[in-house]
Design a protein with these regions (language model features):
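Alpha-helical membrane-protein topology signature
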Residues: 1-194
Length: 194
């Protein structure tokens, strides 16, 4: 638990700085408090998950998966922001290439955190054999995310909220669907206990 607590603080600290960097053009108030507050929130969340896992064992592993996923999201956005801020390119084919690069960097980060921390999979299986499986599961997760979002936004009639809110809701539901797929795929395919 002590190692996990320290790692959750590290994730929280790195995440805080990535939020500050990637949101520098958004003028978010009080963002400078994040390096102090966010690591503590991550650690408290993991401690709560630890105690909840006494009743539902999967909760603790899922909490670590969510922390890693949040970090991966921020790495994705930060790498994309770095490429956009440094080139001024905000659309077109090059911007799509930037997005592909940021996705790949986030997947590499995700692989190592999930392998060695979330799923504690320390087998000496070759990384060159595991990573393609991991990338395949992640890519299927990406396709699920886009597909669910497309169906939600384009095929389900809008009700109660405006179109922008509907699109955001679709993105949230799509992300949850992809999160479930990725968790199950990593747990039972890539890092399955033999």
């Amino acid at each position: 638990m002590k190692k996990d607590f320290i790692l959750s603080l590290i994730i929280g600290e790195v995440a805080a700085w990535l939020i500050i960097y990637s949101s520098k053009n958004l003028n978010i108030p009080y963002v400078n408090f994040l390096p102090v507050v966010f690591p503590l929130l991550c650690a408290i969340g993991l401690i709560i998950a630890y105690f909840l896992s006494k009743k539902i064992p999967v909760i603790y592993q899922l909490a670590k998966f969510i922390l890693v996923g949040g970090l991966n999201f921020l790495i994705d956005i930060s790498v994309l922001s770095l490429l956009i801020f440094s080139t001024g390119i905000t659309s077109g084919l090059l911007q799509s290439g930037f997005k592909a690069i940021s996705f790949i960097v986030a997947v590499f980060n995700s692989f190592f955190w999930n392998k060695y921390w979330t799923f504690s999979y320390n087998k000496n299986k070759e990384v060159f054999k595991e990573f393609p499986q991991f990338l395949t599961v992640s890519t299927i997760g990406l396709l699920i995310n886009v597909f669910v979002d497309y169906i939600f936004v384009n095929k389900i009639p809008v009700f109660v909220v405006d179109l922008k809110s509907w699109a955001q809701l679709g993105a949230v539901i799509a992300s949850i669907a992809a999160l479930i797929w990725n968790y199950l795929g990593y747990k039972f395919i890539v890092f399955k206990k033999e």
